[in-house]
């Protein structure tokens, strides 16, 4: 990766991270750029022709604390394509309590893809990649954050519904439900 490409990618990723308004993002851009350089070195000819369809990710574990809950760890998964034109950020608690049977829930806090890239299918591929990586980390249910809940009838609503995201009814007999868009990655837990 040339220095000019590295600087441009860093600028785009920094802009995406700044838009999330999170305060734990130190080191993420450097690690994503390192992942991009490693991935670029082993690209196939076909992948090299369309780098916007090749995704890289970085998982960061952070320590959190508040007076009510005490301390806990939180995982932050960031995902972007090699061109840095699409970006997603997801948080999930790595803890699973087998006594309470709480599912591990992932929360998509940022999902940025342009309309042009969405038309190419990059958005759908990115969310499928995010789901696969989340499931690999043991996430049972993937939620779209409250701030991202689309208005009914909009393309975002139709798109998320088409990807299998939905809302449970208030009297859902399953042991866990939320009134926001979500998708079950693992049916039994």
Predicted features and spans:
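Conserved acetyl-CoA binding element of GNAT-fold acetyltransferases
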Residues: 102-115
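Active-site rim helix/loop that mediates acceptor-substrate recognition in acyltransferases
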Residues: 24-80
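Conserved beta-strand-loop-alpha-helix junction that forms the acyl-donor binding cleft
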Residues: 143-157, 173-175
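Conserved acetyl-CoA-binding loop-helix of GNAT-fold acetyltransferases
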Residues: 113, 119-132
């Amino acid at each position: 990766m040339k220095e000019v490409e590295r600087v441009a990618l860093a600028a785009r990723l920094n802009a995406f991270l700044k838009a999330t308004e999170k305060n734990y993002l130190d080191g993420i851009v450097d690690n994503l750029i390192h992942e991009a350089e490693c991935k670029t070195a082993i690209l196939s000819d076909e992948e090299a022709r369309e780098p916007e369809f090749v995704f890289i990710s970085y998982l960061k574990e952070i320590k959190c604390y508040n007076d009510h809950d005490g301390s806990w760890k939180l995982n932050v998964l960031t995902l972007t394509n090699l061109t840095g034109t699409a970006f997603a950020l997801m948080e999930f608690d790595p803890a699973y309590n087998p006594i309470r049977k709480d599912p591990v829930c992932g929360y998509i806090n940022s999902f940025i893809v342009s309309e042009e890239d969405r038309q190419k299918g990059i958005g759908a591929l990115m969310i499928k990649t995010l789901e696969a990586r989340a499931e690999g980390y043991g996430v049972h249910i993937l939620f779209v954050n409250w701030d991202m809940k689309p208005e009914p009838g909009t393309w975002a609503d139709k798109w998320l519904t088409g990807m299998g995201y939905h809302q449970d009814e208030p009297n859902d007999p399953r042991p866990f439900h939320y009134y926001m868009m979500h998708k079950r990655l693992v049916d039994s837990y």
